[in-house]
Each structure stands twice: as structure tokens, then as C-alpha cells.
């Protein structure tokens, strides 16, 4: 049924004056009348009165996005359920937390290795705190001492004869070994036939520790 045609025909039937030409334009009254007639139908099809929220009447304008999110919940978009978001957040949290744990385990392993190395160095006073670099220097010095013992073809090397040099000395490794050999004059040499070992402590001299602790 053409609403514009019927309206123009009805108006011409009661009034002798000719209809205005603007009344016959379909774009003035056709779409507006169709929207006015079809809007209640589509609103009743989308939201029935039983399903409509109490804040939004059936005949009113459609709700905004913010109001719809407040009514139906924020996670109504497809593919973004709360469970998936929580699982993703948990994986990211575990990834961030694994870095500090690995670094802490590495530090603990290094510290325990240096503690074991300090126990292998003889004649170190119990109240002396050695840094990592000093521990490595003493370990290399003790290894050089043991190599000298083997090179001189002596009997079992006496750990008490090893002196812990904690002072920082200049020069190359060879000069350092020469100085250590000069300081190890008290280390027991190989015994000849009929000779007896002199009793007494031949450990590190106390002045070496005093010089190191006074620095």
C-alpha cells in the first residue's frame, strides 16, 4: 500500500485545491513513515518485553555500548572469555618469575663453589673473610706451591709450609713464583739418610696476615 499516494488522493478528495507538488516527493515522507512503522517491529523482535532490561523501555532508543556492557557484562565479545584472559595472565606471571629464580640459583651455586674452594686452601685464619678474587689468587698460589713440591721430587708436601700471600704484588707470574720460592725457605726439604726432621710449626708467618688485615 502506497502511503504517499493514498495520503495525496485523500487530501485531493476533500479539498478542491490541487495537491502541492512537494507532497508527491517520495523522499520526504516515504522513508520517515517506513522507519516510524518498522521501528517498533524491529525493537520487539530484538528485545521482547520479557527480556528487556528495566532501565531500557521497549519503545525507547537502543542502549549505548557502555550501558550494554554494564548490563550484560564486559566480557561479552567473542573470543575473549574471562578464563582465557586469566590463563594468559598466569603464563606471563610465571615467565617473569622464572628469571629471578634462575639468577638466584646461579648465584647460590657460585657462592657454594667458592666456599668449597676456600676450605681447600690451608692455613687460612678462621676470622679472615676472603673475597672471590683473593680466593682465586690464593688457590693459584697453592697450586703453584704443590707443583714446586712435585718438581723437587720431595716426599709428601706439607700444607703447613704454604704461606698465604694476601698482599697485592706487581710483576708477572714467573716473578711471583720466584718470590714465593724465596719465602718458602722453611718448607721441609727431602731428608737424607740418617737425618731427622726438625720438629716445630713451619706454617705461614703471622706478619703476612697482619700486613693484609692492616690494608
UniProtKB/Swiss-Prot annotation:
The modification Phosphoserine is found at residue 109. CDD domains: bHLH_TS_HAND1 (cd18952). InterPro entries: bHLH_dom (IPR011598), E-box_TF_Regulators (IPR050283), HLH_DNA-bd_sf (IPR036638). Residues 65-75 have a biased composition (Low complexity). It is found in: Nucleus, Nucleoplasm; Nucleus, Nucleolus. Residues 92-104 have a biased composition (Basic residues). Efficient DNA binding requires dimerization with another bHLH protein. Forms homodimers and heterodimers with TCF3 gene products E12 and E47, HAND2 and HEY1, HEY2 and HEYL (hairy-related transcription factors). Interacts with MDFIC. Interacts with SOX15; the interaction enhances HAND1-induced differentiation of trophoblast giant cells. Transcription factor that plays an essential role in both trophoblast giant cell differentiation and in cardiac morphogenesis. Binds the DNA sequence 5'-NRTCTG-3' (non-canonical E-box). Acts as a transcriptional repressor of SOX15. In the adult, could be required for ongoing expression of cardiac-specific genes. This is Heart- and neural crest derivatives-expressed protein 1. The lineage of its organism: Eukaryota, Metazoa, Chordata, Craniata, Vertebrata. The gene is HAND1.
